[in-house]
Amino acid sequence: MTDEGPSKGGYRRVLLKLGGEMFGGGSVGIDPDVVGTVARQIAEVVADGVEVAIVIGGGNFFRGAELQQRGMERARGDYMAMLGTVMNCLALQDFLEREHGIDTRVMTAITMGQVAEPYIPRRAARHMEKGRVVIFGAGTGMPYFSTDTTAAQRALEIGCEVVLMAKGVDGVYTADPKTTPSATLFETITHREVLERGLKVADATAFSLCMDNQMPILVFNLLTEGNIARAVGGEKIGTLVSTPASGVA
């Protein structure tokens, strides 16, 4: 895997990571307007022949770490959050198929035979080769692992060129721009720098996994219309997080 950015013409196989809290539009549950907007942007890139896999979080329903703070066993809270991710997956699948005619498969790390296929890497890759969008639910199927880590692992296993990490901000900043107005945006940064600076873009496990395997991460603002197509097309938006091929950060 090389990670100096997209080849001419953009990326051809991508893993799109969507935060669950964005699906809720800032509240608990699913906001149909948000899901519809995301589905429309995904349909645009699929129409251009890009192979797309998606990992969705469940933060609009549950967060295991937050439930733990209220006294719940962490593992049980994480399993509840996994179920929340599947609800988000099914919602996105519905919008993609019903409104845009995009053939879609939901694959889960926990067996849910009536609503999704089990996650089998080679089958997922084959679906993508046939032009189907693959949506991964239930995280890794194990507690204590975030959906950011799931995105990194799935991207590596099915041969994606990049993890497109959609956020509610424009990219990676020197500090949280919501609390520090003077924070500045990085156009590029290495995985190691993100970890050493303690920048809260995604969890450290996900970044370490991508760093060790030279998987680039493009962090961009999902709330800007057309940004998914811009990210896939290789336009300079957001922040490209990468590690030189030599492995020296």
UniProtKB/Swiss-Prot annotation:
Principal cellular location given in the protein's record: cytoplasm
UniProt keyword annotations, A-Z: ATP-binding, Cytoplasm, Kinase, Nucleotide-binding, Pyrimidine biosynthesis, Transferase
Location in the cell: Cytoplasm
Catalysed reactions listed for this entry: UMP + ATP = UDP + ADP
Gene3D superfamilies reported in the protein's UniProt record: Acetylglutamate kinase-like
GO cellular component: cytoplasm
Function per UniProt: Catalyzes the reversible phosphorylation of UMP to UDP.
Protein name: Uridylate kinase
Species for this entry: Saccharopolyspora erythraea (strain ATCC 11635 / DSM 40517 / JCM 4748 / NBRC 13426 / NCIMB 8594 / NRRL 2338)
